[in-house]
Regions:
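Conserved non-catalytic scaffold segment of RNase H-like nuclease domains
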Residues: 2-4, 9-103, 149
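Short, contiguous clusters of charged residues that form electrostatic/catalytic patches at enzyme active sites
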Residues: 85-89, 135, 160, 164
């Protein structure tokens, strides 16, 4: 079975948060393979103006305090951003038919994606029962770390880092089933 790590960059914290970008990588949680990747910027005007998603001022202010590289990637991405519907269709096309999705926190990324797919009237491209949560693994292994590559709060860089963290944690916990 193929696994995918998904990360979102958003302009809010609720299930209706506008999605600024989506990053995803295919990976083997019990090995060291990280495969094909996906990265797309989402037009915030599409999220808010067309689909009624809700910007959170606290999150916008939080973004202003992030690194120059993260802020510039977010701004530059809006120039070539896809509509929410186009971005979700592209993510669905990227994912294998039978996939186990992961994210850092099940109550954040998965909730926002489920809401977004529902808004654009597209089916969720995975079975919700297969959703996996990195935050739980990190809680069981709080001292395990992986060297960070890339830009913090870049959806693709974060997805790669999170996939490597799952692999690292499961190497030290071979009895855990993913």
């Amino acid at each position: 079975m193929t696994h995918v790590m998904i990360d979102l960059e958003t302009m809010g914290q609720s299930a209706l948060a506008p999605i600024a970008s989506i990053g995803a990588v295919l990976f083997d949680p019990h090995g060291d393979w990280i495969g094909d990747s996906f990265h797309i910027h989402v037009d915030l005007n599409s999220c808010v103006g067309w689909w009624g998603m809700q910007m959170d001022p606290e999150t916008v202010l939080w973004w202003l305090g992030q690194s120059e590289a993260a802020r510039q990637a977010l701004i530059a991405g809006q120039v070539r951003a896809a509509s929410l519907s186009e971005a979700l269709s592209a993510l669905s096309r990227f994912l294998p038919t039978s996939v186990t999705p992961w994210c850092n926190g099940a109550s954040f990324d998965f909730a926002i994606l489920a809401t977004a797919y529902r808004l654009v009237k597209k089916p969720l491209p995975w079975e919700f029962r297969k959703e996996r949560d990195l935050r739980t693994l990190k809680g069981l292994n709080p001292d395990l770390r992986v060297e960070r590559d890339g830009v913090h709060h870049n959806a693709l860089d974060d997805a790669r880092h999170q996939a490597r963290l799952v692999q690292h944690i499961l190497q030290f916990n071979p009895d855990l089933d993913s």
